[in-house]
């Protein structure tokens, strides 16, 4: 953490000692400990938020001339943990729906909105790239005010959403669908109704598909944004078939926790099956663009050699079933992991 914006202003954080130490490490061409997530992503997928964001030559020259130069060109905003779903691999820290299930008093973990809105007011004209996360960004109150300080003509927006709500009446979607450059990253891991609703608890498959088709009808750029895990590793062909049929791009993300869900930690038998599934997808769609085939090839390498994994000695595959039983009891699920993923369940017993 580089600063707590409940105790410091954003300006104090930007010019504080931790950000300064990160800048100094970057100027030496070194990875700072605070950049470990980007480092891991680049090692496993070849790309990260750091590599996909563009800095103008003028900005780079100004940074070279003065390490403390500040111009806000790219901004990632996780407005709050307000969310309507209880996804099985989420928790009560990042989803208010999970807080409700666990009967924890609702505690919105949020940025200081007025401070962010002031930042947008003073720097909004410079912003070229904006990433919106959550909780669920389409449910965030006050986000419309923040957006009003930006110039839709000059900013590229990326929104990560579970797309489970009715979007035709959603105020944030109604604003952003009119902006010229918005990329929607839709978080889902399965293209099967029962498996989708198991993982994305409280979401309805039919509403989800309806929303995707509405977005396409509205001329939006829509990507599937799955997390590579045991839930999709043996169903990749089905997933890719769905994405191709709906004309979706694919942008993979990492899922490393809980460890039980990382397919690369499981047995050689399961990893071999996952490799076979990747090979089927590559054979079928290897010549298609925007389907992240290169990432699948990287995943294949990590399945074949998982020696890079940390804390593997602490991993017990057999605990995966117990983990799911606990989740199923907590969420009062009628569908069961062992019934939906029988091959996985049989191998990890």
Which positions does each model-derived feature cover?
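N-terminal pre-core extensions flanking Radical SAM catalytic domains
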Residues: 1-108, 121-125, 292-349
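Alpha-helix boundary recognition
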Residues: 14-15, 27, 121, 177, ...
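Core AdoMet radical
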Residues: 72-82, 93-112, 125-140, 152-168, ...
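Helicase-associated low-complexity regulatory tails and linkers flanking the ATPase motor
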Residues: 107-119, 146
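A short acidic, amphipathic alpha-helical/loop segment
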Residues: 119, 142-149, 169-175, 198, ...
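Conserved C-terminal portion of the radical SAM core fold
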Residues: 156-158, 179-185, 204-348
């Amino acid at each position: 953490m580089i600063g707590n914006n409940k105790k410091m202003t954003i300006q104090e954080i930007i010019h504080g000692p931790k950000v300064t130490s990160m800048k100094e490490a970057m100027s030496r061409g070194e990875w700072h400990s605070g950049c470990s997530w980007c480092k891991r992503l680049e090692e496993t997928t070849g790309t990260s938020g750091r590599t996909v964001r563009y800095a103008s030559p003028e900005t780079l020259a100004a940074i070279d001339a003065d390490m403390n130069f500040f111009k806000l060109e790219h901004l990632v905003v996780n407005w709050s943990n307000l969310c309507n779903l209880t996804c099985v691999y989420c928790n009560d820290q990042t989803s208010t729906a999970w807080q409700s299930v666990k009967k924890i008093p609702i505690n919105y973990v949020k940025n200081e909105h007025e401070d962010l809105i002031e930042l947008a007011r003073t720097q909004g004209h410079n912003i070229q790239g904006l990433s919106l996360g959550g909780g669920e960004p389409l449910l965030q109150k006050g986000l419309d005010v923040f957006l009003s300080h930006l110039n839709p003509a000059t900013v590229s927006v990326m929104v990560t959403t579970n797309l489970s709500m009715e979007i035709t009446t959603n105020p944030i979607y109604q604003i952003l669908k009119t902006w010229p450059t918005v990329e929607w990253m839709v978080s889902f891991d399965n293209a099967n109704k029962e498996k989708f609703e198991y993982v994305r608890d409280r979401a309805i498959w039919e509403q989800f598909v309806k929303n995707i088709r509405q977005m396409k009808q509205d001329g939006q750029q829509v990507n599937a944004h799955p997390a590579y895990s045991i839930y999709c590793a043996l169903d990749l062909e089905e997933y890719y078939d769905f994405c191709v049929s709906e004309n979706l791009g694919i942008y993979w993300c990492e899922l490393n926790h809980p460890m039980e869900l990382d397919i690369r930690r499981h047995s050689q038998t399961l990893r071999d099956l996952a490799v076979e599934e990747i090979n089927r997808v590559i054979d079928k769609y290897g010549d298609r663009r925007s389907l992240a085939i290169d990432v699948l090839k990287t995943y294949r390498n990590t399945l074949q050699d998982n020696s890079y994994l940390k804390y593997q000695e602490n991993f017990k595959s057999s605990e995966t079933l117990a983990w799911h039983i606990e989740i199923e009891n907590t969420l009062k699920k009628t569908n069961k992991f062992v019934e939906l993923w029988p091959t996985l369940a049989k191998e990890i017993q």
